[in-house]
């Protein structure tokens, strides 16, 4: 049976809040700025913990790779929270296009959304290989440049943090430095 999933349309850029899983907190928080600059209303999810990690097992096969399970768990927990208008919420997930199962996360997520009672939630794909041709999420050259700059800057902040953290005199000073650096983007 084929499921006709809801599409993320260009018009939804103005009306929908896009939820993004927290895969690399420093880089993704910076990426959030790039997406907002381009007109997208988005939010990086901060929900985590063992309760969140167990949620996806209700809707995803337990043989699914653990990172996929965690990402789907984050989305379902956020949708269950009551914090979002479910008729004006969309999800954004990356697709690698490689041999890893990560290219299938989007299909696992859509299936889990239907099972969890959220068939109306569109899922947009962030990929550079044309895997989802009907997505209204547009990766323009200016957005791609900003996104790459955010990822590189986030990588540098993380590398700097990892180098100075063992030598900090005040516990948490390295993390504060990352927050200050992130705030200056």
Regions found by a protein language model. Give the residues of each.
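An N-terminal assembly and electron-transfer interface module characteristic of large anaerobic redox
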Residues: 1-184
């Amino acid at each position: 049976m084929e499921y006709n999933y809801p599409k993320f349309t260009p018009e939804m850029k103005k009306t929908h809040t896009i939820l993004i899983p927290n895969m690399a907190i420093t880089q993704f928080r910076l990426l959030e700025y790039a997406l907002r600059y381009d007109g997208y209303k988005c939010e990086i999810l901060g929900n985590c913990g063992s309760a969140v990690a167990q949620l996806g097992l209700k809707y995803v096969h337990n043989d699914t790779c653990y990172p996929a399970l965690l990402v789907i768990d984050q989305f379902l927990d956020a949708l269950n929270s009551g914090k979002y208008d479910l008729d004006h919420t969309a999800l954004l997930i990356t697709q690698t296009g490689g041999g890893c199962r990560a290219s299938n996360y989007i299909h696992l997520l859509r299936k889990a959304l239907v099972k969890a009672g959220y068939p109306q939630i569109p899922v947009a794909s962030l990929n550079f290989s044309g895997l989802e041709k009907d997505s209204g999420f547009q990766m323009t050259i200016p957005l791609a440049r900003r996104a790459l700059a955010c990822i590189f800057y986030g990588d540098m902040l993380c590398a700097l943090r990892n180098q100075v953290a063992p030598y900090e005199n005040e516990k948490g000073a390295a993390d504060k430095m990352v927050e200050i650096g992130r705030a200056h983007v």
